[in-house]
């Protein structure tokens, strides 16, 4: 081991010895660190040392990896908890920013000063007083349990003291104590334990009685320990004595109680509310009596004044917090009005954001979507989704119009009238939801309206205006078309079987080959007679038919049969069983006054009269029921006058009660019928013509004159068709992915189709078009032609609108582009007119303009670009010097005619600010410049 052993440890060394590595492995010489070891044992020791160092390094790395994994798990858990919806973000407590502002770590504020103590003695308002929170059911349960435990503890306190004494005697007994005493003490202790256990096991109803003494309850301990300081002693004690005490009556107020309360309060002998509660004799507190009288008894329905409306609007603005109005505070500031009254008045009348009047189709669509999302329960969220409508409007619209069941009928029979009056007797007036349980085919709104109609009918009968049958019929609306058709079907099914069989036998005798049953025969005959019945109903709706009907009624009145007499007697009995109170009469009178006031204060009355005065009278007698017609030869002013006068006449006629009733019963169904017929004609009949034209064009016998599609074969764009077009555009990407299983996109060539994989199919969006090739058997079929024609009729105009309408992003790009072009044009115009002075060149006094550059290019010019290229690329200077050594290349080109593109490019280059050349000792060597444009035109200018 006399030779020198070299060991290369890497970075850690003890002695630096320069050596040369193998020449075959390294191309250059390197100096490395080495260890000098004279013996093999020394080399092994060094090796073991490095092994230990490596092991410790591996352990350290492993420990760091474990720590990293643990930290990753912690971060994942924190991220999961952060994204959980049920864990709310921690917020700063609000009480930190509320008085008192000077608090220590325990939220304790300094003692009161002399001024504060004086204000407290004088009963001044305490600004530190907090508003009482509403009691929750859990807090009420805690209070009852605490009071019960306090009463039980006070009751068993003497027994517990005696128990402790007897127990101490038993513990202290010794040999001097007789067995008799021990036995007596043991029996007494067991008796005390039984009494204590019995009292402690009593229920709340047995302990919390009206005769219990609640003065022994430690209210301070309950407020501090049981409620942990969240309620004050005064709040806990007041809650128990004024509300939760069992001696107070908490049942619903009966009618006798309300009447007696009203009498005692309005009596001149009224002194105070405690005396009134004592005289009432129903175990009501003074606060209960005052609250009942202020909120319900004295709150009769009175008109809102202008001052009240102004005050209510101001209060809603003051008490509004983040869009939510505190109606309790508003009601407190409005004496004589309840919370529901002020809320209803503001939301239904005074709220400027709430829209009134007829519902549009767009609002109905929003309402249906909101109900499908939130359900027909949370009407506040539904109203927020619909916008400009309150919750009651949304509920009424959904319940009475959009979601009205097909079996709900507006008309009431005599049996249903009896059921309604019985339900009112059972449940009382106003409980229409409960009354609906007895009449499931009627809505609560229909029951209320029918009850008011019965009251009005009895008043008319008592006044002698009509008989009982006419009084019962008044107020009912005219039946709709679908209801009349349903009645025809029911009446047809109720035809006696004998008559049906007789007609069938006569018809079968004349036609022996008849294979129909009597039921099938009669159904076929009834189906043929239904259009005639509809025409007869339409005839009855005409005004001329009323005269004939009146004459027939006179004849029928003279010869009235017994059934009608019984019906009139039955109607009289129903009206006689109806009890009308003074409140009902007062309500009907106020309701009529309200309707009259609304009629006189209608919105368009003044405007219509003013417009009618400004319009020049025309010589045409207009009928509100007829549409205005024009003569093509009339002037445009005359046509405008006709339109304005017809609109004014329609509004005036609509204000008339008789014509308005006729409109709501008959004419309002005309427009939907016309629209339905128009759509059916366009989608079905016109589509057939388009389908025939499509098949004719695809056939071989098509001429050049047959290429044009039939005119007026598309529907006008509507909200429904436009929404359908939007829905199809949204679903286009999914449809493209479905069709990609069988077809390829148009931008995929035949050679690329082999490499078109599933990933590319899944990435298809709605902007790419598919190359869908259908067979001639499909495209030439009538079904495909009809489908094409109907889709064309519905979606052609919405597609044109979608193409013609510019998107917001495209509009922004276009405006930016136009502004840039205008700015560039203005700048070029100013430069041309020498309104903008370019930066002066360092070597001469010449100003560069597009005109001067064009003149120099036509005559030849000198441009030195050496320094310019050197500034743009540092390597270019080296290349230029290398080229100079080889030789200078010059190209003598005389430019006489330049294309317009080159001139524009040169003008753009000239418009840029010139760079000053670098200072050099000698004259720069001439070179060449290349100007590359977008059209790849290279321009080389000779430099003299």
UniProtKB/Swiss-Prot annotation:
> Which PROSITE patterns does the protein's record reference?
HTH_MYB, MYB_LIKE
Q: Where is this region: Disordered?
A: 1-22, 911-935
Q: Where is the HTH myb-type domain?
A: 245-301, 351-406, 407-459
The protein's superkingdom reads: Eukaryota
Per the entry, what this protein does is: Binds to the promoter regions of RNA polymerase II and III small-nuclear RNA genes, type 3 RNA polymerase III non-coding RNA genes, small nucleolar RNAs and transfer RNA genes. Required for expression of mature 21U-RNAs.
Composition bias of kind Polar residues appears in 11-22, 922-935
Name the tissues where it is expressed.
Answer: Broadly expressed in all tissues, including head, vulva and tail.
GO MF, one term, reads:
RNA polymerase III type 3 promoter sequence-specific DNA binding
Where this protein primarily resides, as one coarse class? Answer: nucleus
Q: Which residues bind DNA?
A: 273-297, 379-402, 432-455
In terms of Pfam families, this protein maps to: Myb_DNA-bind_6, Myb_DNA-binding
The name under which this protein is listed is snRNA-activating protein complex subunit 4 homolog
Q: Nucleus: present as a keyword of the record?
A: yes
Q: Can you list the GO cellular component terms from the UniProt entry? A: nucleus; snRNA-activating protein complex
Phenotype when inactivated? RNAi-mediated knockdown from larval stage L1 results in decreased 21U-RNA expression and disrupted distribution of prde-1 foci within the nuclei of germ cells.
What keywords is this UniProt entry annotated with?
DNA-binding, Nucleus, Repeat, Transcription, Transcription regulation
Q: Any idea where this protein resides? A: Nucleus
Compositional bias segments (type: Low complexity):
911-921
* Any GO BP: protein folding
In this chain the Myb-like domain maps to: 177-244, 304-350
């Amino acid at each position: 081991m006399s030779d020198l052993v070299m060991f290369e440890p890497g970075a850690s060394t003890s002695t630096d010895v320069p050596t040369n590595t193998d020449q075959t492995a390294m191309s250059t010489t390197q100096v490395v660190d080495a260890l000098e070891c004279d013996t093999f044992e020394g080399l092994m020791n060094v090796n073991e040392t490095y092994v230990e160092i490596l092991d410790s390094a591996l352990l350290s790395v492993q420990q760091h990896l474990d720590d990293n994994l643990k930290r990753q798990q912690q971060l994942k858990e924190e991220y999961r908890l952060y994204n959980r919806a049920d864990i709310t973000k921690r917020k700063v407590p609000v009480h930190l920013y509320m008085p008192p502002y000077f608090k220590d770590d325990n939220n304790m504020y300094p003692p009161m000063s002399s001024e504060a103590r004086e204000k407290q003695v004088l009963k001044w308002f305490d600004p530190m007083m907090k508003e009482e929170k509403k009691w929750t059911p859990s807090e009420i349960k805690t209070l009852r349990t605490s009071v019960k435990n306090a009463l039980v503890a006070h009751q068993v306190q003497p027994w517990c003291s005696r128990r402790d004494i007897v127990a101490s005697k038993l513990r202290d007994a010794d040999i001097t104590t007789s067995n008799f005493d021990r036995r007596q003490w043991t029996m007494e202790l067991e008796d005390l334990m039984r009494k204590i256990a019995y009292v402690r096991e009593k229920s709340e109803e047995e302990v919390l009685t009206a005769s219990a003494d609640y003065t022994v309850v430690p209210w301070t301990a309950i407020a501090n320990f049981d409620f942990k300081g969240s309620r004050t002693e005064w709040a806990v004690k007041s809650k128990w004595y004024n509300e939760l005490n069992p001696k107070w009556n908490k049942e619903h107020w009966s009618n006798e109680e309300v009447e007696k309360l009203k009498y005692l309060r309005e009596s001149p002998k009224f002194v105070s509310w405690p005396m009134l509660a004592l005289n009432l004799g129903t175990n009501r507190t003074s606060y209960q009596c005052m609250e009942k009288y202020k909120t319900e008894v004295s709150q009769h329905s009175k008109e809102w004044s202008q001052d009240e409306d102004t005050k209510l609007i101001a209060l809603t603005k003051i008490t509004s917090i983040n869009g939510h109005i505190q109606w309790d505070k508003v009601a407190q500031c409005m004496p004589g009005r309840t919370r529901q009254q002020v809320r209803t008045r503001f939301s239904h009348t005074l709220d400027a954001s709430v829209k009134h009047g007829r519902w549009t189709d767009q609002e109905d669509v929003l309402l249906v979507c909101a109900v499908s999302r939130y359900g027909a329960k949370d009407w506040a969220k539904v109203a927020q989704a619909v916008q400009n409508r309150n919750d009651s409007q949304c509920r009424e619209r959904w319940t009475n119009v959009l979601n009205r069941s097909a079996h709900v009928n507006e008309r009431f029979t005599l049996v249903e009238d009896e059921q309604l009056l019985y339900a009112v007797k059972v449940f009382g007036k106003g409980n229409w939801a409960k009354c609906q349980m007895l009449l499931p085919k009627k809505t609560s709104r229909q029951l209320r309206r029918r009850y008011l109609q019965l009251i009005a009918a009895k008043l008319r009968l008592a006044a002698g205006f009509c008989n009982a049958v006419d009084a019962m019929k008044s107020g009912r609306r005219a039946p709709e078309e679908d209801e009349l058709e349903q009645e025809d079907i029911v009446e047809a099914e109720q035809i006696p079987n004998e008559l049906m069989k007789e007609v069938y036998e006569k018809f079968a005798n004349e036609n022996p080959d008849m294979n129909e049953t009597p039921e099938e025969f009669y159904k076929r005959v009834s189906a043929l007679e239904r259009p005639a019945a509809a025409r007869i109903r339409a005839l009855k709706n005409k005004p001329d038919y009323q005269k004939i009907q009146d004459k027939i009624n006179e004849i029928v009145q003279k010869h009235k049969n017994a059934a009608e007499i019984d019906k009139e007697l039955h109607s009289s009995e129903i009206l006689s069983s109806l009890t009308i109170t003074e409140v009902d009469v007062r309500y009907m009178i106020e309701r009529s006054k309200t309707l009259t006031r609304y009629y006189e204060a209608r919105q368009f009355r003044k405007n219509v009269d003013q417009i009618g005065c400004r319009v020049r009278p025309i010589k045409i007698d207009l009928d509100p029921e007829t549409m205005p017609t024009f003569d093509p030869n009339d002037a445009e002013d005359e046509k405008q006058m006709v339109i304005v006068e017809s609109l004014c006449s329609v509004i005036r006629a609509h204000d008339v009660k008789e014509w308005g009733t006729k409109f709501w019963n008959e004419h309002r169904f005309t427009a939907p019928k016309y629209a339905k017929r128009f759509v059916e004609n366009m989608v079905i009949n016109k589509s057939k013509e388009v389908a025939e034209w499509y098949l004719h064009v695809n056939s071989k016998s098509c001429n050049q004159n047959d290429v044009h599609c039939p005119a007026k074969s598309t529907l006008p764009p509507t909200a429904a068709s436009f929404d359908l077009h939007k829905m199809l555009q949204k679903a286009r990407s999914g449809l493209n992915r479905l069709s990609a299983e069988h077809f390829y996109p148009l931008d995929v060539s035949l050679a690329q189709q082999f490499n078109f994989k599933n990933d590319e199919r899944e990435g298809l969006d709605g902007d790419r078009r598919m190359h869908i090739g259908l067979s001639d058997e499909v495209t030439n079929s009538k079904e495909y032609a009809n489908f094409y024609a109907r889709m064309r009729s519905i979606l052609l105009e919405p597609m044109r609108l979608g193409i013609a309408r510019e998107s917001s992003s495209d509009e922004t790009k276009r405006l930016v582009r136009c502004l840039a072009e205008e700015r560039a044009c203005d700048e070029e115009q100013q430069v041309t007119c020498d309104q903008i002075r370019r930066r002066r060149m360092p070597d001469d006094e010449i100003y560069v303009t597009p005109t001067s550059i064009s003149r120099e290019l036509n005559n030849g010019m000198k441009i030195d670009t050496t320094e310019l290229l050197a500034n743009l690329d540092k390597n270019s200077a080296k290349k230029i010097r290398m080229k100079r050594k080889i030789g200078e290349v010059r190209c003598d080109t005389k430019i006489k005619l330049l294309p317009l593109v080159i001139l524009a490019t040169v003008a753009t280059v000239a418009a840029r600010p010139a760079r000053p050349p670098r200072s050099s000792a000698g004259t720069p060597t001439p070179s060449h410049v290349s100007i590359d444009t977008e059209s790849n035109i290279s321009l080389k200018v000779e430099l003299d």
